[in-house]
From Swiss-Prot, chain B:
Locations listed in the record: Mitochondrion inner membrane
Gene Ontology MF terms: proton channel activity; proton-transporting ATP synthase activity, rotational mechanism
Record's subunit section: Component of the ATP synthase complex composed at least of ATP5F1A/subunit alpha, ATP5F1B/subunit beta, ATP5MC1/subunit c (homooctomer), MT-ATP6/subunit a, MT-ATP8/subunit 8, ATP5ME/subunit e, ATP5MF/subunit f, ATP5MG/subunit g, ATP5MK/subunit k, ATP5MJ/subunit j, ATP5F1C/subunit gamma, ATP5F1D/subunit delta, ATP5F1E/subunit epsilon, ATP5PF/subunit F6, ATP5PB/subunit b, ATP5PD/subunit d, ATP5PO/subunit OSCP.
Membrane topology: Multi-pass membrane protein
Protein name: ATP synthase F(0) complex subunit a
Catalytic activity field: H(+)(in) = H(+)(out)
A single Gene Ontology CC term: mitochondrial inner membrane
Keyword field: ATP synthesis, CF(0), Hydrogen ion transport, Ion transport, Membrane, Mitochondrion, Mitochondrion inner membrane, Transmembrane, Transmembrane helix, Transport
Organism: Loxodonta africana
Function: Subunit a, of the mitochondrial membrane ATP synthase complex (F(1)F(0) ATP synthase or Complex V) that produces ATP from ADP in the presence of a proton gradient across the membrane which is generated by electron transport complexes of the respiratory chain. ATP synthase complex consist of a soluble F(1) head domain - the catalytic core - and a membrane F(1) domain - the membrane proton channel. These two domains are linked by a central stalk rotating inside the F(1) region and a stationary peripheral stalk.
Similarity remark: Belongs to the ATPase A chain family.
NCBIfam families for this protein: ATP_synt_6_or_A
């Protein structure tokens, strides 16, 4: 298990060393080369879905595959058992208090991994999923914001296309207002002119009437002056005689 | 390895350098946003611990956050790795712990005295002490202040070393009893298991406590 870590660490170290600067000894300052490698790690290769397969939690599957052609399925197990027994019997590995503490630790670790391993793995996955969900939500909200902006812009553009209706209406309104004002003023002019002409006519009429009255009064005055006293008496006697004649005629005919 | 555990001042340089450098392999640096389970859980644990540790500091104090995180991780990981059989925990050596504690403590106290002398000196006298006790209190508080790095180092050393010694001794007892009376080794083996659980807890707790105390000293002295 740790062998894979070491191998991958060595691989990344080797590749980074390949890209890193190479400073040869005894080279003058001006020819030093720095930062020749690619400065970016993108695109990062995807994480593998599952870790490498191991047996007993320690020994990678590749070891078993390595020994399979020569020794079959039981080969690695026999090798392991033999090694352990060899080390124990020859006291190459001495059983000390460390063995006991190692055994206790092994018991604890195996128990913890068996019981809580999957739970912790799921918890870690949940953390990653929450992170991805937060980022996804942010991305979606940015996209929604941009789309809302686009819709808003389109709407405003459509409104702008229909602006000419508004202008036509306003233009018609203004034309009507002009028309009304023009007619009003025309009417005012007509009225004023008519007033003036009526004034002149009424002045003329009044003058003529005054002249007539004056003439009539003058005539009457003169006629009345011209009637002498003698004429007046004769006229009155004639009138009385006419009235008597009429009274006789009236008596002769019965009143209806 | 057994001799190294039972002496405080013997300094094994070669294995110690290896033991100090090894935990770095267990803390990989992610080069992507969504990482594998190992790194995700590490990030989550670090966030959990550091939220507690760093919540009390102002902006200036937060410049210590990397130091505190590194401290917690280093002490925790070296303690845990020291529980493995045939491994070595550098935190059992007083030299390592002193060389961590003294600079860190000095770094919290000396700037405090330099820039905020009044506040730092005021910490030496708790509020509401009666007048006649003041000289005694000042002396006692000064001594307690000056002894803090030693307490930090010795606490860590003693805890880890004591745990290792207990496990070692109980293991030896198990081995010795196995030839005398085989049935009692179940008792001692269970004791070893329980001690290992305790040691696991102690390893992590001591790391946290170390960093917490440094954070508190930092907070006291601004």
């Amino acid at each position: 298990m740790l062998s894979r870590v070491v191998l991958s660490a060595a691989a990344t170290a080797a590749s980074s060393l390949k890209n890193a600067a190479f400073i040869g000894p005894g080279v003058i300052q001006a020819t030093r080369i720095f930062h020749t490698g690619q400065p970016s790690l993108a695109p990062v290769p995807p994480l593998p879905e599952y870790g490498g397969k191991v047996r007993f939690g320690l020994i990678p599957e590749e070891f078993f595959q390595l020994l399979y052609p020569k020794t079959g399925v039981t080969g690695p197990y026999v090798l392991g058992t033999g090694l352990i027994l060899y080390f124990l019997s020859k006291e190459i590995y001495v059983i000390t208090s460390e063995t006991v503490s190692g055994a206790a630790l092994a018991v604890l670790v195996i128990y913890a991994v068996k019981k809580y391993g999957a739970v912790i793995g799921q918890f870690a996955d949940k953390l990653s999923e929450e992170k991805i969900a937060r980022l996804e939500e942010f991305k979606q909200s940015c996209i929604r914001y941009a789309e809302d902006g686009i819709d808003f812009e389109k709407e405003k553009q459509a409104v702008v296309q229909k602006r000419h209706y508004l202008f036509d209406v306003q233009r018609n309104n203004i034309a009507m207002a002009f028309e009304v004002a023009y007619r009003e003023r025309l009417h005012t002019v007509y009225r004023e002119v008519k007033n003036r002409l009526d004034y002149h006519i009424s002045v003329q009429n009044m003058m003529r009437r005054k002249e007539q009255e004056h003439m009539i009064n003058w005539l009457e005055k003169k006629v009345v002056q011209s009637i002498s006293a003698q004429q007046e008496k004769e006229t009155i006697a004639k009138c009385i005689e006419d009235l008597k004649l009429l009274a006789k005629k009236a008596q002769a005919q019965p009143v209806m | 390895m057994n001799e190294e555990l039972s002496t405080f001042f013997y300094v094994p340089v070669g294995t110690m350098m290896l033991a100090i450098a090894f935990p770095a392999i267990l803390l990989p640096t992610p080069n992507r946003l969504i990482t594998n389970r190992w790194i995700t859980i590490q990030q989550w644990l670090i966030q959990l611990i550091m939220k507690q540790l760093l919540s009390i500091h102002n902006t200036k104090g937060l410049s210590w956050s990397l130091m505190l995180i590194t401290l917690t991780l280093f002490i925790g990981l070296t303690n845990l790795l020291g529980l493995l059989p045939y491994s070595f925990a550098p935190t059992t050596q007083l030299t390592v712990n002193l060389s961590m504690a003294i600079p860190l403590w000095t770094g919290t106290v000396v700037p405090g005295f330099r820039y905020k002398t009044k506040i730092s000196l005021a910490h030496l006298l708790p509020q509401g002490t009666p007048m006649f006790l003041i000289p005694m209190i000042i002396i006692i508080e000064t001594i307690s202040l000056l002894i803090r790095p030693v307490t930090l180092a010795v606490r860590l050393t003693a805890n880890i070393t004591a745990g290792h010694s207990l496990i070692h001794l109980t293991g030896t007892a198990t081995l010795t009893l196995s030839s005398i009376h085989s049935m009692t080794i179940t008792v001692t083996f269970v004791t070893v298991i329980l001690l290992t659980i305790l040691e696991l807890a102690v390893a992590l707790i001591q790391a946290y406590v170390f960093a917490l105390l440094i954070s508190l000293y930092l907070h006291e002295n601004a």
